[in-house]
């Protein structure tokens, strides 16, 4: 008996057509042509920051076009198979539909990322909270989780700094995710993450609760006008260290930068040279200063308009329970799964996509 796929194909076609309208594919093609002209200008590379911004936007725009065109081709192929009525082709098309539907849904989420900085790379900082050695171990687990998530998507990452705890785990870690819409995607992870498990560090095998904070900021571009006066900086050079303060470098190449007006401190010790560490630390400092400015502007807007405070900022957003049962649950969207090992190995897309949809619905109601 032939499978009738007409209704599913019709629904997917309507969804994809809506996505093409929102993304304005023809507009994307014009944008790509303009960026290609800019990238071909030999003078562009005299300004490395601008050149990198242009090439990043070009890569992102080409990626959007390729995703839409690829999905449209796949849907057209399935529709053509359905029209032919061949049972073997229909069976193959029916098997392909769930994956195509999932991919279209993923692109639909991408259309919701329209914030001013959503297109940027992301700086992610992890910090151990309450919970002692378990919190430090939890911070290390989160670092691995996010790096695995990026690896699954083929995204480049760069770890700028890790501060190891005395017994195990990490006090903090800072890394960059280099991918189109990395900030818009990962900003859903900003907040406090709570772990419940039997502590491997407790001789009595008691259940322990530990916390770690995740802070996500966009990478700064020249257009953001985040100007830093050299006289506002204190730069300390020191030797990179490993667990227990043991030196792992034979030269003083690690860099700590303190922004005196705000008290913001950033550190980088994972690069090979002092100059590379300083450059990486400045990237993080600029991102933090931009985020501080945005927070101040948002607070002033709320004061003027009398709008509600953002209670989700810095608050507990997700529970990871490994004992007495297995469950990861997001407290904002109620998305949950018992596949804790998968989540900790980077399977975060269901949580991230649900939060992006939830965030947009909240913004639309405001």
Curated annotation (Swiss-Prot):
Organism in which the protein naturally occurs: Frankia casuarinae (strain DSM 45818 / CECT 9043 / HFP020203 / CcI3)
Residues modified to N5-methylglutamine: 246
Pfam families referenced in this protein's UniProt entry, alphabetically: PCRF, RF-1
UniProt entry tagged with the keyword Lipoprotein: no
NCBIfam families in the record: prfB
Top-rank taxon: Bacteria
Family: Belongs to the prokaryotic/mitochondrial release factor family.
Processing and modification events after translation: Methylated by PrmC. Methylation increases the termination efficiency of RF2.
Protein name: Peptide chain release factor 2
GO molecular function, one term: translation release factor activity, codon specific
Free-text function comment from the UniProt entry: Peptide chain release factor 2 directs the termination of translation in response to the peptide chain termination codons UGA and UAA.
Cited HAMAP family: Rel_fac_2
SMART domains cross-referenced by the UniProt entry: PCRF
Coarse class of the protein's main subcellular location: cytoplasm
Keyword annotations from UniProtKB, A to Z: Cytoplasm, Methylation, Protein biosynthesis
GO cellular component, one term: cytoplasm
Subcellular compartments: Cytoplasm
Disulfide linkage: none
Coiled coil (residue ranges): none
